[in-house]
Every structure is written in C-alpha cells, then in structure tokens.
Amino acid sequence: MGCMSSKLVPEGPSGNQAVVEVFNNERNKEYNRQNPHQNRGPRDPTKDPKNAGPPPEGQRSNRKVKKYRDKFDPRVTAKYDIKALIGRGNFSKVVRVEHRVTKQPYAIKMIDRVQGKEVFESEVAVLRRVKHSYIIQLIEVFETKDKVYMVMELATGGELFDRIIAKGSFTERDATRVLNMVLDGVKYLHGLGITHRDLKPENLLYYHPGHDSKIMITDFGLSSTRKGPENFMRTTCGTPEYIAPEIIARKPYMCQVDMWAVGVITYILLSGTMPFDDENKTRLYRLILKAKYSYAGEHWKDVSAQAKDFIDKLLVVSPGDRLSAADALKHQWLISNAASSSNKNLHRTISQNLIHRQSTRANSTKSAKSTRSTKSNKSNRSGRSLRSEHRRVMPDEIDELHRDPDVQADLASLG
C-alpha cells in the first residue's frame, strides 16, 4: 500500500502570505508588520449597483473563516481564535490562528481522522520526537473521534523559490547557506532514525521575511521511523521528480533516499530547472533509474566545478555510494562557502527559469480545463511547474512501469 500525503496547496491570492506551517514566538511583531492587512478585504471600486459583482474577497474570506470555525472542536476555539484559512489538502485544512491569551500566531492543521489516518499518525509521531532549529515545531495536539488538530509554529517567509525569485541576487554562496541548514536538519533526523521521504522545495520554508531568515523543513506526512539497525523501508511513496532510483526499482531502502532528493534540490537551486524532467511518467522514471542528467545550457557555465561535484556525489544510483548528510556537510563546496563558492550572480537565469515554468504550467492547466482530451502523454518539458503538490508516486503506476520491457532491462542492469 502506498503512502498518501495531505500536502497543502495555496487557497488563492491572499497578499504575500504563503501556505506555511512554522513560526517562532519572537517573530510575532515582525509578522504583524509584514501582514498589516491580513483580514481586510479589497475596497469596493464602485457603488453603482449595476456594476456589482461577486462579494469582495474579504467577505468571502470571513465566511470561510466562520465555516471552518464552526467545524472546530470547542476546546480548540476556546484557546485559539481562528483568523484565516491558509491551506488545504486531500484530508486536511490549515488555518492561521491566534492564541487568545498570548496573542501569538500559530497554524492549526485539522485532519480527518479516518481518511488522513496514515498521514497524521506518521507526522505526529515524528514531530513529537524532534526539536531542532531547522525543523517545524509541534506545539500541541487535540484529538476527537473524527478529527485531529495539530497546533504548529507559523512561518511567514514563504517558500524557498518564491524568495529566490523576489531576491535581487542569488549566488552559490547563498545556495550553500541554504543547503547547510537543510543538511543539518536532515542529519539530525537521520540520527534519530527518521527518513523524511518527501524533501522538495515546497517543504522548505523561510522562518521570517528578513534576509537573514533560516530555512525550516516541514510536512512529515510521508516520514518513516526506523525500528532497528537493519530495518528497511519498502513503501512506494514520494514525489515523482524527487524519488530515488531504489524506490522505483522496488528495492528495500533506507535514509539515503533523502540524500537523492537533496541532490535534486541542489540542481534546481543552481539552475531553476529539474535534473529529471518529462511529462511522461515512464520516461521520467527511466531517466531517474539511470541517473541520466546533464549540465547542458549556458547557465551551467557559471556554476563551479565543486558545485557540480557535490550534485554528482548525491545523484548516484547506488545508495551506498551516495553522500550521507554528515559527509555532505563536509564537502569542500559547503565548507569553503565564501572562499571557494562562486560569487557570480545566478539570479537572472534561475528566476527566469522558475517564472517561465510556473507561468507555462498555469497556462497549460487552463488549456487542459478547456478541452475534454486528457489522453495525450506527449512530453512537455518547458511547461511544467516546479511545484508538485498533487503529483504523487502511486504504487499502481510503478507496477505498470515494471511490466515495460525497456524498464525491465534497465532494472536488470542495476542488479
């Protein structure tokens, strides 16, 4: 049986507030300064009744808040004032709340206890164990017969790549700073026997809007905890573009799958493109099985050899040959940071690639909605967003993949 996640997706435009799950107490004032109009709807541009359109966004938002407030357990609403709906998933909703006494802002994830059982049990079990500077913190949990309410810190800095697009510059030095934080958190998790299994840019959030903000690892719905030294995982789960070859090959696997994902993230971080990219799942998975990627393109000429070496030591088919989190932190590219990492501004290329993929993905989605034909599997490498909230690895598609003769040959070559 495959893992399924209630990955959160943005509800819609709401200022510059991203779907976020982390925050820390001392940032409350900064949060309020950054979001002074969080609960205000747009002004009515005209009072002419004939120009009246749909209710203002603020009114719709208030109705949604009331709708979800009514669904919350009284114990929760007695302690927390629900302010806004900020995200939703397959079996979950996330709201921004304020502690009624301290006025601290938090996020509460409300999960359907039956449909989201696998997700909440995994996430709660992990978050109750961890306490790390670069990992989301669970504050408390309320449970009823039908629902689970997870109270978590709230981050206000947005997703990793949103910040890069908005930032005026981005260098390898900036990339190594981000990766040092991510790897420090991953090393901590692996030391506890915890494998995240869904590391990707959407799950790396900035702590606050400031330029010196740290990165936080979030969303542990697919995570797994090792029961013993030889305890392997076998569940087919993850996000297609970030999944490791051993999962596709249906081999027993361990925490090295997270390091493969870090390699994919690093590649994207330095180029704004994915190392393995194809709309057709079979072709995509075959690229991953062979670790078939390249540094083609003008933008890669500006990336140092050390950075490419770092990626090459992570995107290795054999898990045993992949860098561990501890070893990755010792790689010369990360250690030297300012000394050896290139200071060339990569921002223009990266942001253009990210924006292009996001805009073409949006246009592609609109086109798909206007036609009944959904059977085409033609590759569309330039038209796919880096966001992957609804793209999950499904066990049945891996079953079908293994019936393909070409894939069988690829698997045989892996041994």
Curated annotation (Swiss-Prot):
Domain of life: Eukaryota
Compositionally biased region (Basic and acidic residues): 41-50, 386-406
Reactions mediated catalytically: L-seryl-[protein] + ATP = O-phospho-L-seryl-[protein] + ADP + H(+); L-threonyl-[protein] + ATP = O-phospho-L-threonyl-[protein] + ADP + H(+)
Polar residues bias (residue ranges): 353-362
Disulfide bonds: none
SMART domains cross-referenced by the UniProt entry: S_TKc (SM00220)
Alphabetized InterPro entries for the sequence: Kinase-like_dom_sf (IPR011009), Prot_kinase_dom (IPR000719), Protein_kinase_ATP_BS (IPR017441), Ser/Thr_kinase_AS (IPR008271)
CDD domains in UniProt: STKc_PSKH1
Region span, Disordered: 1-70, 353-415
Family: Belongs to the protein kinase superfamily. CAMK Ser/Thr protein kinase family.
Residues forming the catalytic site: D198
Domain Protein kinase: 80-334
EC number: 2.7.11.1
Gene: PSKH1
Name of protein: Serine/threonine-protein kinase H1 homolog
EC supergroup of this enzyme: transferase
GO molecular function, one term: ATP binding
Biological source species: Pinctada fucata
Comp. bias (Low complexity): 363-385
Keyword annotations of the record: ATP-binding, Kinase, Nucleotide-binding, Serine/threonine-protein kinase, Transferase
Binding site for ATP: I86, G87, R88, G89, N90, F91, S92, K93, V94, K109
